[in-house]
A protein has these predicted regions:
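Enzymes that bind and transform nitrogen-containing heteroaromatic metabolites
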Residues: 1-119
Length: 119
């Protein structure tokens, strides 16, 4: 796989922002700060378990959408990994939850704004 520069030309009006990675991967808060400094106020992130977990655990999401399909894959990487919760009072609870039927699938839409436990 080549460099991203092979796929994006200057004619696309694209700015490539370099964010140094850490041992844990891409620091999502640094990504958000870099985008906000350029005037971007909303960001749609679509990804698998690692990406969603990184943004969720980083406290950078204000909305989370998870679709559930009637398909059994067996063992594998979980869709969302969270640290253990010692008590029910400390459990994560979305501000609002809606669900939508999409054929045989169900989409859960969680509003996360201002629901993070205080530390």
């Amino acid at each position: 796989m080549g460099s991203i520069n092979n796929y994006i030309s200057e004619n696309n009006h694209v700015e490539i922002i370099g964010i140094p990675t850490t041992d844990e991967g891409l620091p999502v808060r640094d990504c958000i700060r870099a985008l906000r400094s350029r005037g971007l106020l909303r960001l749609f992130v679509e990804g698998g378990g690692d990406t969603v977990t990184r943004f969720f655990n980083g406290g950078t999401l204000d909305r989370l959408q998870i679709s559930v399909a009637p398909t059994v894959f067996g063992s594998g990487r979980p869709g969302l990994r969270l640290p253990p919760t010692p008590t029910a009072q400390e459990a994560f609870r979305p501000k609002q939850c809606s669900h939508f039927q999409l054929g045989d699938d169900i989409l859960f839409d969680f509003e996360l704004e201002k629901v993070w436990p205080s530390k």
